[in-house]
Swiss-Prot record:
Keywords (A to Z) from UniProt: Coiled coil, Disulfide bond, Host cell junction, Virion
Pfam family for this entry, one: Cauli_DNA-bind
Role of this protein: Plays a role in virus cell-to-cell and plant-to-plant transmission. Interacts with virion icosahedral capsid and movement protein, thereby facilitating virion cell-to-cell transmission through plasmodesmata opened by viral movement protein. Also interacts with aphid transmission factor, attaching the virion to aphid stylet when the animal feeds on an virus infected plant. Aphid saliva may later detach the virion, inducing release of infectious particles when the animal feeds on a new plant.
Protein name: Virion-associated protein
Stated family: Belongs to the caulimovirus ORF III family.
Cellular component terms per the entry's GO annotation: host cell plasmodesma; virion component
Coiled-coil region(s): 1-31, 38-59
Primary location: virion
Record flagged with keyword Cell division: no
Subunit and interaction comment: Homotetramer, through coiled-coil domain. Homotrimer when interacts with icosehadral capsid. Interacts with capsid protein, and with Movement protein.
Superkingdom as given in the UniProt entry: Viruses
Subcellular location(s) per record: Virion; Host cell junction, Host plasmodesma
Region (Capsid binding): 122-129
Length: 129
């Protein structure tokens, strides 16, 4: 079991370490404050990357071949536009026997017991609407 003297020594060591770390942190913060802001350095690096990529693209022989091919293409389009627009789907009235429905826009089902909307309550039912 640790006695009070050992505990006091360990606490004093931890306190001295903490003070030295505090001084180190202040020194690091001062060093960072004296340098250029991060945003400016990132913009500089990004500009260099863009310039390098632009130079690589301009110097690439395949790029020159593409530009020559585009320069030699005919001025008129090789594939003409369609003269008539394609007809859309012909969606006529629903002609399949639609028993169980009775909406006029779907056509008549011929079923006398077909449901209609708005719903009409049968005789004897309380009026809900």
């Amino acid at each position: 079991m640790a006695n009070l003297n050992q505990i006091q020594k360990e606490v004093s060591e931890i306190l001295s370490d903490q003070k030295s770390m505090k001084a180190d942190i202040k020194a690091i913060l001062e060093l960072l404050g004296s340098q250029n802001p991060i945003k400016e350095s990132l913009e500089t690096v990004a500009a260099k990357i863009v310039n390098d990529l632009t130079k690589l693209i301009n110097d690439c022989p395949c790029n020159k071949e593409i530009l020559e091919a585009l320069g030699n293409q005919p001025k008129e389009q090789l594939i003409g536009q369609p003269k008539e627009k394609g007809k859309g789907l012909n969606l006529g009235k629903y002609s399949y026997p639609n028993y169980g429905v009775g909406n006029e826009e779907l056509g008549s089902s011929g079923n006398p017991k077909a449901l209609t909307w708005p719903f009409k309550a049968p005789a004897g039912w309380p009026n809900q609407y």
